[in-house]
């Protein structure tokens, strides 16, 4: 296609790429797209989009180009490793390799050369996502999806081994000649067969892992494969689990302690005795290809039957999500250094593909989160890893016992808030003004938030934060709570329903932005009137954690006015009931050493 320089051809290509990006565009095979030179011909890209102040300051992001799924995170010989899907040639999806970065603290990162690139027949047309497993001798092994037929998008599973296990940086990886080690036999859909998980070892000495797939037109499936040597694999007679949700990408399956401790559990460690099994629950997470979000269930793993059963029979229908915002293709790993489980997730851009090409970069990784089982046993709790607090400035701004009346907003001054960490505890004096929850929206937080956003006056709430706000409030991103009385059911009272929402509909004056509201119900008891919120603000991303990590929302925003020193922070209350900020603490966030100083 030799006419990329023409306006017509460029417009057509931008439309194609935008459609791919909005659909996720994570698993498509096409020829090389080298669009960097063509970026200068793009019309209609606002100057604010290419402003360097919109590039994140402390989130994981390479200096340029496209990234997506986090792959094979691990801790090895004193170093944290993160591999990730990366296009070395441009800011759109394509030419994917496994980029590789290492860190001592999960905050400051050094980029190494790509670890896995197309080089053998079994991955000639793509090296897609996968996971790492620590063998009994402590050596890591990577399993990943390869594409070896471009015409039908045929997917197989391959293995890669470190060339030198004594190298703590694992700078070189080799692919044995016996790849691929798993192929889609027995009626499996070869075009929907990918993303092998971390393996775990059973009492019988066999390793087991999952591969995500699609059965029929709509059934997501996690197939179980067994092996003694990571070379010869056999599929189990039945899947670990399946549900009518659409294709399951990037499955993740891991144990969590069920006895109230926040410690992680190594996936590869066998739990064989009944007493130990009683102290452990299992989490099965899947990334929904059609809906572009991650959901999980908590349940029981029957090792003899090779089956997983969610505790909630409706768990595959009423999805609990890691994050109700822009967060996908997640992967956890066990950190033996601090005995915790850490969650990584990809956040794509929400501007256009033309914008991404113009600015030269697309995609970030969310701040790593520690995850553990809530004492209720019903869901996970998530919290930014403690290391991120090292980036906080020395002197925080503190606001205490500040009453915010109905319709009032209060500016938080004394710091630059475009790159900040804000923790706030709210108190609601009375819940009597809470509105009745519409039964039609009792299971649809997103619809409820869209219908009644941050500016819609309510009873108890909306109250929360306006972040990345301009001086005249022409631009603002709202992160807030709203409290409802439960929908009437048989005359029972029930506990109040808490909605958490991020509303970016006024985040930018740029009319071309994708600015959806994001929302989730928070499973918390607010009858005492107390609830907390933490927001990590980083120029073009807002990551928020409600009620101690019971609900999380990540949103990408691109202000044109509220940039750098012009960004402001407010507490607001658009409800009828007054609220009190019992304490707000806000820190400016420093920039880490990211990707060799970028």
UniProtKB/Swiss-Prot annotation:
Q: In which tissues is it expressed?
A: Expressed in leaves and flowers. Weakly expressed in seeds. Expressed in growing roots, node and the rapidly elongating zone of the internode.
Q: Which residues are glycosylated?
A: 164, 189, 348
Q: What class of enzyme is it?
A: hydrolase
Q: Where in the cell is it found?
A: Secreted, Cell wall
Practical applications: CIN2/GIF1 is a potential domestication-selected gene that controls grain filling and yield, and could be used for further crop improvement.
Protein name as catalogued:
Beta-fructofuranosidase, insoluble isoenzyme 2
Major site of localization recorded for this protein: secreted
Under InterPro entries, the record lists:
ConA-like_dom_sf, Fructan_Metab_Enzymes, Glyco_hydro_32, Glyco_hydro_32_AS, Glyco_hydro_32_C, Glyco_hydro_32_N, Glyco_hydro_beta-prop_sf
Annotated knockout phenotype: Slow grain-filling resulting in reduced weight of grains containing loosely packed starch granules and reduced levels of amylose and amylopectin.
Q: Which family does it belong to?
A: Belongs to the glycosyl hydrolase 32 family.
Which Pfam family would be a valid example here?
Glyco_hydro_32N
Q: Which SMART domains match?
A: Glyco_32
User: According to its UniProt record, which residues of this chain constitute the active site?
Assistant: 69
Any GO BP = carbohydrate metabolic process
EC annotation from Swiss-Prot or TrEMBL:
3.2.1.26
Query: Could you tell me which Gene3D superfamilies the record lists for this protein?
Result: Exo-inulinase, domain 1, Glycosyl hydrolase domain, family 43
User: Which reactions does this protein catalyse?
Assistant: Hydrolysis of terminal non-reducing beta-D-fructofuranoside residues in beta-D-fructofuranosides
Name the source's superkingdom: Eukaryota
Known function: Cell wall-associated invertase that cleaves sucrose into glucose and fructose and is required for assimilated carbon partitioning during early grain-filling. May be involved in sucrose unloaded in the ovular and stylar vascular tissues for the stimulation of starch synthesis in the developing endosperm during grain-filling. Sugar homeostasis mediated by CIN2/GIF1 plays an important role in constitutive and induced physical and chemical defense against pathogens.
Presence of the UniProt keyword Hydrolase in the record: yes
Mind listing the UniProt keywords for this protein, alphabetically? Carbohydrate metabolism, Cell wall, Glycoprotein, Glycosidase, Hydrolase, Secreted, Signal
Q: One GO cellular component term, please give it.
A: extracellular region
- Give one GO molecular function term: beta-fructofuranosidase activity
- Signal peptide location in the record? 1-25
Induction record: By sucrose in caryopsis from 1 to 2 and from 9 to 10 days after flowering.
């Amino acid at each position: 296609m030799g006419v990329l320089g023409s306006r017509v051809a460029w417009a057509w290509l931008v439309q194609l790429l935008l459609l791919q990006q909005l659909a996720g565009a994570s698993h498509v095979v096409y020829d090389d797209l080298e669009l960097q030179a063509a970026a200068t011909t793009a019309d209609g890209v606002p100057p604010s989009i290419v402003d360097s102040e919109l590039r994140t300051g402390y989130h994981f992001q390479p200096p340029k180009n496209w990234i997506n799924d986090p792959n094979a995170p691990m801790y090895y010989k004193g170093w944290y490793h993160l591999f990730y899907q990366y296009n070395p040639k441009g800011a759109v999806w394509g030419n994917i390799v496994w980029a590789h970065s290492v860190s001592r603290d999960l905050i400051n990162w050094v980029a190494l050369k790509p670890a896995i690139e197309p080089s053998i027949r079994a991955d000639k047309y793509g090296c897609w996502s996968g996971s790492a497993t620590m063998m009994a001798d402590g050596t890591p092994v990577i399993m990943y999806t390869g594409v070896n037929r471009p015409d039908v998008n045929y997917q197989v599973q391959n293995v890669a081994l470190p060339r030198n296990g004594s190298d703590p940086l694992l700078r070189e990886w080799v692919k044995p000649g016996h790849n691929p080690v798993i192929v889609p036999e027995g009626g499996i859909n070869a075009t929907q067969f990918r993303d092998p998980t971390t393996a775990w070892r059973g009492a019988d000495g066999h390793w087991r892992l999952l591969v995500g797939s699609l059965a029929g037109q709509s059934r997501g499936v996690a197939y179980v494969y067994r092996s003694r040597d990571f070379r010869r694999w056999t599929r189990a007679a039945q899947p670990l689990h399946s549900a009518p949700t659409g294709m399951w990408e990037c499955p993740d399956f891991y144990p969590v302690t069920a006895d109230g401790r926040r410690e992680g559990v190594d996936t590869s460690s066998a739990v064989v005795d009944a007493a130990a099994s009683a102290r452990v629950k299992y989490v099965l997470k899947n990334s929904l290809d059609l809906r572009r979000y991650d959901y999980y269930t908590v349940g029981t793993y029957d090792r003899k039957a090779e089956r997983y059963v969610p505790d909630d029979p409706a768990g595959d229908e009423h999805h609990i999500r890691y994050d109700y915002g822009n967060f996908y293709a997640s992967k956890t790993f066990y950190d033996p250094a601090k005995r915790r489980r850490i969650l990584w997730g990809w956040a794509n851009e929400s501007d256009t593909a033309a914008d991404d090409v113009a600015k030269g970069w697309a995609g970030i990784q969310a701040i790593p989160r520690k995850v553990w089982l809530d004492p209720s046993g019903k869901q996970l709790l998530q919290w930014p890893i403690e290391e991120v607090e090292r980036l906080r400035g020395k002197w925080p701004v503190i606001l205490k016992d500040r009453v915010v009346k109905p319709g009032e907003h209060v500016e938080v001054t004394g710091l630059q808030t475009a790159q900040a960490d804000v923790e706030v505890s709210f108190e609601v004096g009375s819940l009597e003004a809470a509105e009745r929850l519409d039964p039609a929206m009792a299971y649809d937080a997103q619809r409820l938030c869209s219908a009644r956003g941050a500016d819609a006056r309510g009873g108890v709430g909306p109250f929360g934060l306006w972040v990345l706000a301009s001086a005249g409030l022409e631009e603002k991103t709202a992160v807030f709570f709203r409290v409802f009385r439960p929908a009437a059911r048989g005359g029972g009272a029930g506990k109040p329903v808490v909605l958490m929402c991020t509303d970016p509909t006024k985040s930018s004056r740029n009319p071309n932005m994708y600015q959806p509201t994001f929302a989730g119900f928070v499973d918390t008891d607010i009858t005492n009137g107390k609830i907390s919120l933490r927001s990590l603000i980083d120029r073009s991303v807002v990551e928020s954690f409600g009620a101690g990590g019971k609900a999380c929302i990540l949103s990408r925003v691109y202000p044109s006015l509220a940039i750098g020193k012009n960004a402001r922070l407010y507490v607001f209350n658009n409800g009828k009931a007054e609220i009190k900020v019992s304490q707000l603490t806000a820190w400016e966030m420093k920039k880490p050493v990211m990707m060799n100083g970028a």
